[in-house]
């Protein structure tokens, strides 16, 4: 998700 959106990766990690 980092390649498309760094924020999305953060949200997905905190689920």
Curated annotation (Swiss-Prot):
Expressed by the venom gland. One of its GO terms (molecular function) is toxin activity. GO terms for biological process: apoptotic process; killing of cells of another organism. It is found in: Secreted. Coiled coil: none annotated. Its cofactor is FAD. Its main location: secreted. It is an enzyme of class 1 (oxidoreductase). Keywords: Apoptosis, Cytolysis, Disulfide bond, FAD, Flavoprotein, Glycoprotein, Hemolysis, Hemostasis impairing toxin, Oxidoreductase, Secreted, Toxin. It catalyses: an L-alpha-amino acid + O2 + H2O = a 2-oxocarboxylate + H2O2 + NH4(+). It comes from the Eukaryota. Its EC number is 1.4.3.2. Transmembrane segments: none annotated. GO terms for cellular component: extracellular region. Contains 2 disulfide bonds. Catalyzes an oxidative deamination of predominantly hydrophobic and aromatic L-amino acids, thus producing hydrogen peroxide that may contribute to the diverse toxic effects of this enzyme. Exhibits diverse biological activities, such as hemorrhage, hemolysis, edema, apoptosis of vascular endothelial cells or tumor cell lines, antibacterial and antiparasitic activities, as well as regulation of platelet aggregation. Effects of snake L-amino oxidases on platelets are controversial, since they either induce aggregation or inhibit agonist-induced aggregation. Homodimer; non-covalently linked. Belongs to the flavin monoamine oxidase family. FIG1 subfamily. This is L-amino-acid oxidase Bco23. It comes from Bothrops cotiara.
């Amino acid at each position: 998700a980092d390649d498309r959106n760094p924020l999305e990766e953060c949200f997905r990690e905190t689920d």
